[in-house]
Amino acid sequence: MNNELFDSPELSQELTSAEYLEDGVIREKLGVDPEIAEWDGPEEAVIGNPEEADDHWHLQSERNSCAVACQEFVAEQLLEREFSEQELIDYAKARDWYDPASGTSITDIGKLLEAVGLRVERSEHLTVSDLAMSLAEGEKVICGVNNMILQEPALADLPGINANHAVEVIGIDYSDPGNPKVILNDPGVENGRGIRHNLDVFMDAWKTSDHFAVIASRREAA
């Protein structure tokens, strides 16, 4: 890949959903809450490399640009080069992948990563073990969550709580087996660099997107 910002072919995937993962926009359906898969015991207390990943964190520059910011974090980690959130915003806006008024459609999260040559998989109904295995393999993870539940866990008990935010999962800390933590780069809060949440709180916030995640990795050389 050369040094141009975006050098892969244009993507032709059409928008298939009107659901959004941004502030104030309601996702119309709630996902089934799968049981938290049992983890047989990681070789390391912390899965992933949160110390390296949190170097790329910053606050999102626009109210609804969380998914763009998370894709910037991931691209910088995997490609070992810097990107500008504003340049990514402009590129996404020109292709209708981002709307400043409503954010990023769930089907468009990851398209910026594909545009810079990364491999992307989008999945729903994942488990925390799926995330842990991806992190252990050096892959990067973006999840759709409800940010209000992350801040006020009791809100998970209210009906109609939907996904409205994107975060990067940068690690899972099993050093206390009775109280594992999920480590995030959350671009929407000032203390979001490497912020830690109890696993059960994260799962409640994550289930509002049907446990949706984008898994990104470098493409293997031909």
State the predicted function of each range:
Residues 1-8:
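N-terminal targeting leader peptides, primarily classical Sec-type signal peptides for secretion
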Residues 8-98:
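Active-site nucleophile-adjacent alpha helix/oxyanion-hole segment immediately C-terminal to the catalytic cysteine
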Residues 9, 14-23, 31-44, 99, ...:
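Noncatalytic regulatory segments and standalone regulatory/sensor domains
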Residues 58, 62-67, 101-105, 123, ...:
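Extracytoplasmic/periplasmic, Sec-exported soluble proteins
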Residues 67-75, 85, 106, 110, ...:
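Extracytoplasmic/secreted envelope proteins and their assembly/folding machinery
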Residues 72, 147, 188:
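Short, flexible active-site-adjacent loop segments at beta-strand->alpha-helix junctions, enriched
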Residues 104-126, 136:
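Mid-length scaffold segments of soluble, non-membrane domains
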Residues 124-185, 221:
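Active-site-adjacent substructure of cysteine-protease-like catalytic cores
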